[in-house]
């Protein structure tokens, strides 16, 4: 559950990591870029069967994450398309690869872009970039005394993991963000825009996240809510998950 969004102010000294405004002058192209802290709670899941089913392992763990929104300055010029990107974390820093590849079309068509931090291994680099701006980000592990599984250790999956944080918080973050963007709550940062379709995208490791979300979460009744949490999915360079 997302409890609150808080816009992060931009100054000459403090601005978003990999800011498109700074490097592409989005404001001169009729777009605005805003960054938000996203506060909430999320469940942590574990595998329930060999077909990708999951069940809750730990409920309601608190987190502080961040999103970045790029949208037309003029709400009337919005296409109604909202593209949510699972920002790629593979290099231990944030790379919004699908934005990099598609921004010209997004801006030309009037699409809204929303990028979400997808893995806490990137927080250290963001804090190094601007500690005051990003120091409050937290994906704290709600069960730090539980060791990593033997399977994870054997398969070599510990390279960018540690007991201080919990990567599994992401799935509920993504679901709750999608429904927030669809709704008309006051805290929805794009509530003034037309929103007809909400899409999910990601590149490489983030594409694999997309596959996992689609296979294990998107069609769970509490996620789909009798409809579709996302209207479409586009993975770039992903592998099966």
For each predicted feature, which ranges?
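Catalytic-loop region of hydrolases
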Residues: 1-100
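Cap/lid segment of the alpha/beta-hydrolase catalytic domain
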Residues: 113-178
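Gly/Ser-rich "nucleophile elbow"/oxyanion-hole loop immediately N-terminal to the catalytic nucleophile
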Residues: 73, 77-78, 153-204, 224
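Phosphate/oxyanion-binding active-site loops and adjacent basic polyanion-contact surfaces
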Residues: 31, 59-65, 94-95, 159-179, ...
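Short amphipathic alpha-helix adjacent to the substrate-entry channel of hydrolases
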Residues: 96-114
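Short, solvent-exposed loop/turn and secondary-structure capping segments
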Residues: 48-54, 78-79, 93-98, 116-118, ...
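Primarily recognizes the serine-hydrolase "nucleophile elbow" in alpha/beta-hydrolase
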Residues: 196-241
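Structural recognition of the beta-strand scaffold that forms the well-ordered cores
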Residues: 36-38, 81-85, 112-117, 199-202, ...
């Amino acid at each position: 559950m997302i409890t609150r969004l808080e816009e992060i102010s931009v100054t000459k000294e403090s601005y978003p990591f990999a800011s498109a405004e700074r490097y592409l002058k989005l404001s001169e192209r009729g777009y605005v870029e805003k960054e938000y802290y996203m506060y909430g709670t999320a469940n942590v899941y574990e595998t329930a069967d060999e077909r990708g089913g999951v069940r809750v392992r730990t409920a309601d763990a608190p987190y502080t994450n961040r999103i970045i929104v790029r949208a037309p300055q003029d709400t009337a010029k919005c296409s109604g398309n909202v593209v949510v990107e699972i920002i790629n974390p593979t290099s231990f820093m944030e790379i919004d690869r699908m934005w990099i590849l598609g921004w010209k079309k997004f801006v030309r068509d009037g699409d809204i872009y929303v990028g979400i931090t997808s893995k806490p291994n990137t927080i250290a680099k963001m804090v190094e970039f601007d500690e005051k701006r990003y120091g409050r980000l937290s994906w704290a592990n709600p069960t730090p005394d539980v060791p990593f599984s033997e399977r994870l250790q054997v398969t070599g999956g510990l390279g960018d993991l540690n007991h201080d944080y919990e990567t599994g918080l992401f799935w509920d973050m993504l679901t709750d963000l999608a429904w927030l963007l669809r709704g008309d709550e006051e805290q929805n940062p794009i509530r003034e825009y037309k929103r007809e379709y909400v899409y999910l995208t990601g590149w490489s490791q983030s594409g694999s996240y997309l596959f996992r979300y689609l296979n294990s979460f998107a069609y769970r009744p509490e996620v789909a809510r009798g409809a579709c949490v996302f209207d479409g999915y586009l993975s770039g360079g992903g592998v099966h998950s």
